[in-house]
C-alpha cells in the first residue's frame, strides 16, 4: 500500500439505518424497553438484513468518511509519498470544536447507545488513539513533522476533558466521551491507558501525569478481569452487559501496546493479557472454520453468525504476540469466507450469506490494517 492520497474513502456502514432522527428515536425507545421501540427495531433489523441496498436508498443514506478508517489506512501504509496531504485528510475528520476538545476524533455520525445519545461531533477515547498513532507515524516525515507534533500535543486537551467515573488511591476509570455517562466501559479505558502512554513517551510537558494516569487505569482494567480471563463490556452486572470477541481483543490489544511503552504496565498486565488471550482461544476460536465467534454472552440477537471485525482484531493480537503461523492461518480463513472476487463483506448470516459489501469501517479496514502488520513482520504471504 503506497498511496500519495486516498486515505479518505466514503462508504456505507452497518449503522446507516440508525444515524437519522428516526433511527435514533427507535434505538432510544428500544433501550428504554418500550414495546413499540422493540417492534420497530426488529423491523429495521429485518429490512436491513434482507434488503440493505434498498433500505439505504429509501432512507436516502449517503456514504461518508469515517475518522477511524482514515487513521487506520495511514497506519497500514508502508510509505506515504505526500504525508502533508495525509495529515490534512486526518485532521479534516477531527471534531470541529477545538476550543472545547482540542484535537479529537469520534464516530462521525450520531450514535444512540445504552449510555445515551452521542452526536456526530462528540469525540471518543476509542477512536482518538488511532489518530494519535497516525500522527506519531507522520512525525517521522520531516515535511510535516512540526505540524504533526503540534496536532499530537493538541490531543492532551481531549484526554483531560474525559470525566472521572471512578478514582481511588490506586485505580482510575474515565468516561467513553466528555459527557455524563451512567456506566463505565472497560475497553474504552484501555484506549485511555494506551493514549496516556503515548503522551508519556511523546509529550514531555505532561510526561509524569500521563504515566501516572496510564498506570492507574491499567490497574483498574486488570482488576475488572473475571476469574475465567474474560472482560465484560461494562464494569458492572446491570442488564445489557455482554462479552464479545472484538471488544475483548480491544482490551488485550491496548494492554499490549501500553506494555510496550511502559515497563510498570508490562509487569502488572502480563498475566491479565495471557489469561485474556487464553479465554479467547478456548471460548471464541472455532476449530472447524478457523474463525472466531462473536459472543460468549450476549444481550441482543441478530441474524449474523460471523463478523469480520472479530477476525480483524483477533488477527491483530496474534501478530502482536508473535503467533505468526496462527495469524496467517486466520488471515487465509477470513479471506476465504469474507472476500469474493476482491470484494469484501463485513458479516455472514446464519444462511451463509455475505452481508455488508465494502462497508469499510466495519471490519474491512481494520482487517487490512492487521494484514499490513503481518506483511511488515515478513511472516504473511498474500
Show which residues each predicted segment covers.
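Contiguous N-terminal and early-domain "leader" segments and peripheral loops that mark the onset or edge
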Residues: 1-32, 57-80, 129-132, 193
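Well-ordered alpha-helical segments within folded domains of soluble proteins
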Residues: 64-79, 120-139, 183-201, 240-260, ...
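Structural helix-adjacent loops and short alpha-helical linkers that scaffold large soluble proteins
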Residues: 1-5, 9-12, 78-88, 136-154, ...
